[in-house]
């Protein structure tokens, strides 16, 4: 059975502009031509062309010793004869997502959009319409195949934003130095009485 494949070609340039579009600092090839080649069968990717650029952001510092991986545009896509549902209209006006991973062998896996595909031995790249689809596929890759993954957001203007795992360690793992968000080191019984914060605009866990 013939299988359709996705292929993308990027042409990196030498300059690297700066922007505030990325949540952590990193540098990548500044301008890349995101072109989708025409496959033999109907492929899941769109034939529109994109310019992909990666910028650095200094507002949030990355943990020491961690350098976010660069998105390699020449990475081949898994072999898939079905459709990922397209990139939706949102990809033209907002963004789409790219997940990458490296497989030790060629093996079959379940697509988050339905159906089965064959991941290639070595690096794989898959474009999806939603971040949740990347998370669903990534969870499956880690739980069943013991494969690490990364995914990125690509904006219509070509900007690439590295998303996950943000500090190099997946969130369900303990990472020394990672700061907790919304932590209160007390039991719920030690919260103040709700009547004391009524109409103040605050919550009992804020005090």
Curated annotation (Swiss-Prot):
InterPro entries recorded: PsaD (IPR003685), PsaD_sf (IPR036579)
Cysteine pairs bridged by disulfides in the record: none
UniProt keyword annotation of Transit peptide present: yes
Presequence range in chain numbering: 1-54
Superkingdom of the source species: Eukaryota
SUPFAM superfamilies in UniProt: Photosystem I subunit PsaD
Primary residence: plastid
This protein's UniProt keywords: Chloroplast, Membrane, Photosynthesis, Photosystem I, Plastid, Thylakoid, Transit peptide
Compartment(s) of residence: Plastid, Chloroplast thylakoid membrane
Alphabetized Pfam families for the sequence: PsaD
Membrane topology: Peripheral membrane protein
Gene3D superfamilies the UniProt entry points to: Photosystem I PsaD, reaction center subunit II (3.30.1470.10)
Cellular component GO terms held in the UniProt record: chloroplast thylakoid membrane; photosystem I reaction center
A single GO BP: photosynthesis
Family: Belongs to the PsaD family.
Listed PANTHER family: PHOTOSYSTEM I REACTION CENTER SUBUNIT II, CHLOROPLASTIC, PHOTOSYSTEM I REACTION CENTER SUBUNIT II-1, CHLOROPLASTIC-RELATED
Reported function: PsaD can form complexes with ferredoxin and ferredoxin-oxidoreductase in photosystem I (PS I) reaction center. PSAD may encode the ferredoxin-docking protein.
Name assigned to this protein: Photosystem I reaction center subunit II, chloroplastic
Species this chain originates from: Cucumis sativus
Gene from which the chain derives: psaD
